[in-house]
Amino acid sequence: MKLTVGVALLGCGTIGASVAEALQHARDAIERRTGVGYELRSVAVRDPHKQRPAALERRLFTHDAYSVVEDPSVGLVVELIGGTTDAAELLERALDRGCHVVTANKDLLATQGPRLRALAGSRGAELRFEAAVGGAIPIARTLDDALAGDEILSIAGVLNGSCTSILSAMEGGATFDEATALARRLGYAEADPSNDVDGHDPAHKLALLAQLAFGLAVVSPRIRRTGIGAITQRDVARARMLGLRVRLVAAMALRERGLVAEVAPVLVAEEHEFGRTAGAENVVQIVARDAGRLVLRGSGAGAIATRSAVMGDVVSVLRGLRHRRDPIARTHHIALEPAIEIEPFFGSLARVAEIPHLRLWDDAVTSAPAAALVNA
């Protein structure tokens, strides 16, 4: 007997509409891959009468998101409305009744992820959020599956496609303001880009990765961050003359006293994985005790990258229903007393005389064992 799951979508903006169309068009292919069928039951939107993609029937739309998440015929909720207040309550209600959830809401997960993951685990539900971490790059699945039996030493990367796009444009001669305006036109930056350029977005992603890699209930406000707003065209030009590039790097590692984590613009060699990023590309470097150094790269911004990650999570949930596995809910709370803060990561990096306010990235700081890092 074929298993069929009811799916509901919260939000039908640019990304939501793209995901809704993918759910409709890829249904047969996904069923062949997973052995599980699904039916799109409802789409919650603010205005159900607004013009929507032709592939979506009018009957699917409703303005009552709460009735959607509490519908017993819905076994999987895909949340793409963003924000934290309404989204938190909606996801809590869905998870509380054992409904699986896929979300791209990094702002919510970076502050309430540990609580929501614990709730999911207690109810036997899955909470998947690949799109919230690295766009099209399968970082979460790599940590959850391929490296589940290994010990993660560190994670570092260029995790914000908007900032990479801006810095790439500045390398071509644009000012910061001109580069930011271009990123908006290309769809890589929001109308208000402060969440990206001030470093909040990659800090949110580091918090999520700390939950996945280290089982630590870290929230993003505790992570030191410096954005790219103070980077000038002169900084970028000087770096290029030295064979370097400026990139916003997010990095963290475990030490014996706790976590070291930071987001800041640093200098990277042009030939380094971080230096080879361009446009909206993201790259993440994971160092594990047995597997060594692994590098994942791909698109980190835009609707297509987000859709790819969301659909990958949908497939993962459906496969889990066919071959039932325990959801990942191992997060515990790290005791952060005043004397044991989350320390900044980049303090041990060297400086370059020509650009003294920026530090020079060194891979060596990511691969040392925890005991050695204590004395770094």
Go through each PLM region and give its residues:
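Substrate-binding/catalytic subdomain of NAD(P)-dependent oxidoreductase enzymes
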Residues: 169-170, 178-283
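Glycine-rich phosphate/pyrophosphate-binding beta-alpha loops
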Residues: 293-294, 298-304
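A conserved regulatory-domain signal marking ACT and ACT-like small-molecule sensing domains
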Residues: 309, 314-376
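Rossmann-like NAD(P)H-binding beta-loop-alpha module
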Residues: 121-191, 196-201, 208
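N-terminal glycine-/serine-/threonine-rich beta1-alpha1-beta2 phosphate-ribose binding loop
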Residues: 1-97
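General beta-strand structural signal in soluble alpha/beta enzymes
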Residues: 61-63, 70, 78-79, 102-104, ...
